């Protein structure tokens, strides 16, 4: 530690997120000389406290999205007169972002019954060699365009597993979309 400086570490990553086995040890090691630790969720704080980091001199600061772009302005809400428009978005192409769930929805949409009731849009990067058959895909978008695109949809889904604190569901909620999620992570 440097007596002339205060060091702060923000912890937003863990092995549980991407099924690795070295990230937590590295973070704990780097935290040895830190004066104060900020966690992005209670969930990730609990992981590191259980692995030996002190809860003293730490806090949780939750994230938020830019209200200029992620809001309900010009949002048209579903009136029941067209298929429900389901959407998700992820920058990362990691499978744990929910691709097992999204693949299942894609397969359900093979049925004409569901095609008449539901549309699904995926915004972002896909895992290598992964392709949807029945899902509209859009490359990653900048904040303004992303907010506009989210507002064209009715329901947001996130299948993310062990996400410490994703921004994706926060952005969607601020756009007025109800969220379907797996009870996993922070």
Tell what function each PLM region has.
Residues 161:
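Aromatic "clamp/platform" in nucleotide-sugar-dependent glycosyltransferases that forms part
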Residues 178-181:
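Short hydrophobic beta-strand element within catalytic cores of glycosyltransferases
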